[in-house]
Regions:
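Short hydrophobic/aromatic beta-strand element in the GNAT-like acyltransferase core
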Residues: 44, 109-110, 119
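Short, small/polar residue-rich loop motifs at catalytic or cofactor-binding pockets
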Residues: 105-107
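Short, solvent-exposed loop/turn segments that connect beta-strands within catalytic domains
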Residues: 39-42, 50-51
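A short beta-turn/loop motif at secondary-structure boundaries
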Residues: 36-40, 111-114
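Glyoxalase I/VOC metalloenzyme domain signal
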Residues: 1-6, 11-33, 49-102, 113-128
C-alpha cells in the first residue's frame, strides 16, 4: 500500500453556505469549487486546507447533533489544524471579532465549534 498523504475530509452540514463562511472567512481557507445537483441546487463546497487536502462540505437535511465538549461516542471527534505558537493570540482575537465563542483552551490548543457544532481545534502542539 502506498498512502501518500491526506486528500480530503467530507462533512455533512445542513447550512453549507454558513459553514463555508466559517472556514473561509474566519479560518481563512480558500474556497475551491462548488458542486451542484442535476436540478441546479447546491450540493457541496470544497475549501482548501492549508498545507494539504481539502474539506468537502456536503449539504444534507436533518438537524446537527452537537454533543458535550468530550463524549464517548464513536465517530468524528474534532478537526485539528496547526497554527504557529506566535499566532495563537491572533487566533483568539479573530474568533472574538467573528463572534465565535471559545469552547475550551489548553496551553497548546484553542477549541471552538463551527456553525453546525463540529469541534474545531487550532493547535501549536507539541510546540512548533
Amino acid at each position: 500500500m502506498d498512502v501518500q498523504g491526506f486528500h480530503h475530509l467530507a462533512i455533512q452540514v445542513r447550512e453549507v453556505e454558513k459553514v463555508t463562511a466559517f472556514y473561509r472567512d474566519v479560518l481563512g481557507f480558500s474556497e475551491l469549487k462548488r458542486h451542484h445537483r442535476e436540478d441546479g441546487s447546491l450540493r457541496s463546497i470544497g475549501v482548501e486546507v492549508p498545507g494539504e487536502g481539502f474539506l468537502a462540505l456536503e449539504e444534507v437535511s436533518g438537524e446537527p447533533e452537537p454533543g458535550p465538549f468530550r463524549n464517548e461516542r464513536p465517530g468524528l471527534f474534532l478537526l485539528a489544524f496547526r497554527i504557529p505558537k506566535a499566532g495563537r493570540a491572533g487566533v483568539v482575537e479573530a474568533f472574538a471579532r467573528a463572534g465565535v465563542p471559545l469552547e475550551h483552551e489548553t496551553r497548546w490548543t484553542v477549541y471552538v465549534r463551527d456553525p453546525e457544532g463540529n469541534r474545531v481545534a487550532l493547535s501549536h502542539h507539541p510546540e512548533d
